[in-house]
């Protein structure tokens, strides 16, 4: 892999992660300028030649929508500057929960975002823990889908937890949690929840035994933390010795930090796909920079990506 043939650039949302990725790749972060105007619009420019280069653009697309618009403009500018290939590295893919038409007269946001990226000129997407695997099929370009388990599972192994039980906070996440349980060689329990409205859990029941166990709840993301904290409190009340949680994406919006801090959770472990500034003492973040750097290296060297997946 020659650093002369590729360059890494970043939007403003995840510059910290792009810098760490570059450290692992042994290359400098490319020089781009994002100028924001008084009316809220912004313009993108590359301050060095990218002609004929393989370009990797690191940008998570968590709210607000400016982060997605930045990425689209970065792609467009790279295409117009004659980059050889344009690879969008999107650690957290926003709008992924809008992946199906679950009621009449609604949009399918994930499909629209995939179309926008393709029209802008992206050649490849590298992302992590999509809310629904089928979103990969929304794209007309290759998608390398990584998993946060690549850093979370080794962390759990190092803890060497006795009487371990893996839990899924809902039936929909049972496949993900079951993979963790198989890898760690421990039982799986499920939570069955019902919602009255978005971000609000009406009721929840445990399917399985947690009495005297150390429970780790597995999810893909935590938004308002209503589900994960309710599950932790119910499991603690059912006799669990300790309750932890692990999720790839630290959305943590609204009351999430207070809910986690005041819950039965001992800790909640995320990756650094999204920056977290509201410092809740129970939140820990593990870096996925090395995993993304290794994926970029394999893309450049035409090596298998799937062989590094743990889930």
Feature locations, PLM:
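PRPP-associated nucleotide enzymes
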Residues: 1-311
